[in-house]
Amino acid sequence: EPDSSDGVITVSSLSKTGGVPRYHGALDITKDSSGYMVVNQVNIEQYLYGVVSSEVSSSYSMEALKAQAICARGFTYRKLGCNYRGYDADLDDTTACQVYNNFPETDSSITAVDETAGVVPTYNGEIINAVYFSTSCGTTTTSDQVWGGSMPYTCTRIQNTALDIPYFSNETAFQDFMDGKTDTDVVERNLPMYTWTVSYTDSEM
């Protein structure tokens, strides 16, 4: 644990995409048959500094970073105590939960968290399950189409400012959209994960 509340711990044996990670709070290190397990005990707001910087680029607008901070905070509160009790932890630092400390916190990620401190997304007074994705395929969808079960605050929405829907009434038009040949300006259309393929059997259809 650092000597001061704003101190950090560097773990030189770890390597993340953004370099050697540094951690606020304290580290609990235990050894088991497979190696060492490291659990970072940190307050949620400082944890979010490293989530926002790792989940979205700090070059994004401040309002986008604030939106990410609010979603990530809601996701965190919803997951506390759910899945990792066997490790004396609440979350892991990968896409299984939220990516944490893969890139160092930045002035922008700190500002986004600080300026939304304590704000969470709610529906009917309850914190929502604020799931989000790293790469948009041009539209969102409802929860029942992904996991089953209804979350009424999720909806299908085209991810562009005009909220217009491309012409999908025939196979050629749909294929042109999937191949990026249309003029529809949707978020992240030029990224590799913008389109993907899934297969269903006749019975599943």
Question: What is each residue range found by the language model?
Answer:
Residues 1-205:
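Conserved, single-site charged/polar hotspot
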